[in-house]
């Protein structure tokens, strides 16, 4: 019934720095399959991949507003390093698209890290802010919402009657 399920973690109020340029941003930790939830429209470089996840690579993609503020002269920044919250990340991709979703930060305002890298860099442990799900054709989310909620609660030892832990 479920086609894609992928976690999302984020942090607001960060600053990305490249040389003497700064950009306020959100930092998102995503899995490669997030692209199946929301197309990233990478125009330079690439998106986060499985090797980045497995090796906890310090790489990132940057959104349109972050790119415009850090690289006002334009050009391809892939291979360059920017600093966010005291940690250097190599830019591997740029998304010049605007986001359809603005939950936990839109693409254009974000520096996106591999999910596992963000977990370690910010000491998030097993924290997940958002779980994004798509369902197979012909299935509605409302038809399986209760089942999804039960699975999440069971997997994370949340009491079945707790109405605040999981919001659908």
Language model feature labels by segment:
Residues 16, 26-28, 32-48, 52, ...:
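Mid-to-C-terminal secondary-structure elements
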Residues 10, 21, 75-76:
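Residues that act as N-cap/strand-start positions at coil-to-secondary-structure junctions
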Residues 23-25, 166:
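Short active-site oxyanion
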């Amino acid at each position: 019934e479920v086609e894609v399920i992928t976690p999302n973690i984020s942090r607001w109020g960060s600053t990305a720095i490249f040389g003497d340029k700064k950009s306020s941003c959100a930092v998102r930790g995503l899995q490669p399959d997030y692209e199946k939830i929301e197309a990233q429209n990478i125009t330079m470089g690439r998106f986060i991949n499985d090797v980045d996840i497995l090796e906890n690579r310090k790489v990132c993609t940057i959104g349109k507003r972050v790119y415009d503020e850090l690289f006002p002269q334009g050009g391809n920044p892939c291979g360059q390093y920017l600093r966010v919250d005291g940690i250097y990340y190599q830019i591997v991709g740029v998304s010049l698209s605007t986001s359809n979703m603005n939950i936990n930060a839109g693409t254009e305002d974000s520096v996106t890290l591999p999910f596992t890298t963000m977990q370690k860099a910010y000491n998030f442990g097993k924290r997940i802010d958002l779980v994004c799900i798509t369902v197979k054709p012909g299935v509605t989310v409302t038809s399986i919402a209760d089942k999804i909620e039960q699975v999440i609660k069971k997997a994370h030892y949340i009491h079945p009657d707790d109405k605040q832990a999981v919001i659908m």
